[in-house]
């Protein structure tokens, strides 16, 4: 319980890590790299905690300004279906007795009722909080769950629309969409998805250029794929 504020800080950073990005291929790659970095969130959390005499984990004490910012962030969110303490209990059970699966928590938070508005839903932060406590790669786990629930293509188009087509959407929400689409692109890369496969999936051809509303997914992923491949020494396919 004493690591409560620090865990919330990790979740806040985890969900808002792309706030300084802009909607370009380089920014999308930056978000993809941020996703890879966030895979170590849980390990970083553990490295900043130590056991008390009663076996509790005592977190690194953040500065007052951090605590105040964290409180403000939590107060701006609407009421959660599952309070933080309940999430902590469920995470503890999941790690010790395997009684609270991420699928069950996802459903209890009513995140299985459609993608519309999900990025601004405070219960998505609660689900991320649960994953930070239970998963080694929480951002990867979250995007994987969204994809398994709603479909890879549906999630990709939804995030792309928020980034580029949505009206009256805050920059913060667009930044979160960029972060999660970056996570999706990393997932594609790790699973061996080539730009050629994405081009085929989204029916991108010269005759459809500037007419296909989702050809940008292909162009974004092509840039991300090339740069990730160059960093990993993975050979580029003959046709990307």
From Swiss-Prot:
Top-level division of the source organism's lineage: Eukaryota
Subcellular location, record wording: Secreted; Host cytoplasm; Host nucleus; Host nucleus, Host nucleolus
Induction, as annotated: Expression is induced during host plant infection.
Keyword hit for Amino-acid biosynthesis: no
Positions of short motif RxLR-dEER: 43-58
Keywords: Host cytoplasm, Host nucleus, Secreted, Signal, Virulence
Signal peptide extent: 1-23
Record GO cellular component, one term: host cell cytoplasm
Task performed by this protein: Effector that enhances P.infestans colonization of Nicotiana benthamiana leaves.
Family: Belongs to the RxLR effector family.
Domain notes: The RxLR-dEER motif acts to carry the protein into the host cell cytoplasm through binding to cell surface phosphatidylinositol-3-phosphate.
Protein name: RxLR effector protein PexRD20
Lineage, top ranks: Eukaryota, Sar, Stramenopiles, Oomycota, Peronosporales
